[in-house]
Amino acid sequence: MATPGEGNQPSDDGAPQPLAQLQKLEPRVVRRRLSQARHRATLVGLFNNLRKAVYSQSDITASKWQVLNRTKIHIQEQEESLDKLLKLKASFNLQDGNPNSLEEVKEEYARMYSENDSVFLNSFLQDSPPEWFPSEAVGPDAEEEGEEEGEEEGEEGEEEEEGDEEGEEEEENGEEREVEEYQEEEEEEEEEEKKVDLSHSSSTLLPDLMEFERYLNFYKQTMDLLTMNSIISAHEVTLPIVSAAISHLWQTLSEEKKARLLQVWEQQHSAFADLTEACLELAGVEGSMKDSGVDSQGASCSLESTPEEILFEDAFDVASFLDKSEAQHMSNISAMFATCNSENPEEKFQLYIQIIEFFKSLGCVNTPLNQEPEPPDDDDAMLLKCLETFDDL
């Protein structure tokens, strides 16, 4: 019976040990957290001061990585100015015992802070502590904290029990975890800030992409309409004058007409005949048509695809249409070049006018009849010939 009692005796005596260990660890955890809070407050204050120094009041909400980047640029600019002044000083042979070059200034600055960093920091904090620096870290409290840290080091050196060693390991692991968590928080903040900047840039690019997608859709539907009504032949779809005419049509259309036309084409894209009906319907409701409330995205994007997908689909459709037409009419390539040749400027100009007049007859554009279309860049020779003809008359 004595044996079980003796076996239970050590466990009874060792029961208070975990409680004592917790009591010893509690002040350390509190001091460590207080030190971390002071460190974070110091970093926040430094970033705030840097932000105010390198940014104006309108950009006071800049992110940390932007502040660091701007600070780096600011320091480089200050170094360049200082270097110029020191070179000017050296040109006058001024010997005042101070550095005469930028390298000497850097060396003296590094030597001053490496030798007297603690003295300078204490004097700086006692004389004029900044507003962002915690008041607990200045004066007697800072000294008490240093003494407490020294006592902790002595106690840790004297501890030899296994329980204390385990507590130290847990404490170190806890500190490492807190440092890792702090670093992860900083990385997450930087990633979020970068995502916000990217979203701003993408929001500025989206309208241009949508406008380009709308024009591709209009180009494809217009080309189908012209070929269906025999306004242009199959080998004329690749002529620059045709593209110039379609571009002129797109520029003359108002936003309401663009949205309405693309909406009707999207609803009635099953047959080529519906394209003509779309233009006629647009001409019929032109007088009473108001804002349809359809923006560029709603006018040309389906519910099943994203705007980017629709954009690339239309681009591939136009490219495949042009490639197919070119492959089918390789035998007529000489005739196509003859049409594009500057020897027939009247035919090119007539084709341009024919396309514009066809859409005027459908009521899709309201360009005045006496207004000459904007000539493409490759028709300068034709205009010069026209002017010479008028001079001869």
From Swiss-Prot:
Phosphorylated in P19 EC cells. Expressed exclusively in premeiotic germ cells in both sexes. In females, is expressed in the embryonic ovary. In males, is expressed in pubertal and adult testes, in premeiotic spermatogenic cells. Expressed by some type A and B spermatogonia, preleptotene spermatocytes, and early leptotene spermatocytes (at protein level). Expression begins in late undifferentiated spermatogonia and persists during differentiating spermatogonia (at protein level). GO terms for biological process: activation of meiosis; cellular response to retinoic acid; DNA replication; male germ-line stem cell asymmetric division; meiotic cell cycle; oogenesis; positive regulation of transcription by RNA polymerase II; regulation of transcription by RNA polymerase II. A motif (Nuclear export signal (NES)) lies at residues 209-218. A motif (Nuclear localization signal (NLS)) lies at residues 28-33. Residues 1-25, 124-201 are annotated as: Disordered. The keyword Coiled coil applies. Disruption phenotype: Female and male mice are infertile due to severe gametogenesis impairment. In female mutant embryos, the initial mitotic development of germ cells is normal, but they fail to undergo promeiotic DNA replication and meiotic chromosome condensation. In male mutants, the premeiotic DNA replication is conserved and germ cells are able to partly condense chromosomes and initiate meiotic recombination. However, they fail to regularily continue over the leptotene stage of prophase I. Residues 1-11 have a biased composition (Polar residues). Residues 141-192 have a biased composition (Acidic residues). It is found in: Cytoplasm; Nucleus. It comes from the Eukaryota. Induction: Up-regulated by retinoic acid in embryonic ovaries and adult testes, and by all-trans and 9-cis retinoic acid in P19 embryonic carcinoma (EC) cells. Transcription is repressed by DMRT1 in undifferentiated spermatogonia. InterPro entries: bHLH_STRA8, Stra8. GO terms for cellular component: cytoplasm; male germ cell nucleus; nucleus. Interacts with XPO1. Interacts with MEIOSIN. PANTHER family: STIMULATED BY RETINOIC ACID GENE 8 PROTEIN HOMOLOG (PTHR35254:SF1). This is Stimulated by retinoic acid gene 8 protein. The lineage of its organism: Eukaryota, Metazoa, Chordata, Craniata, Vertebrata.
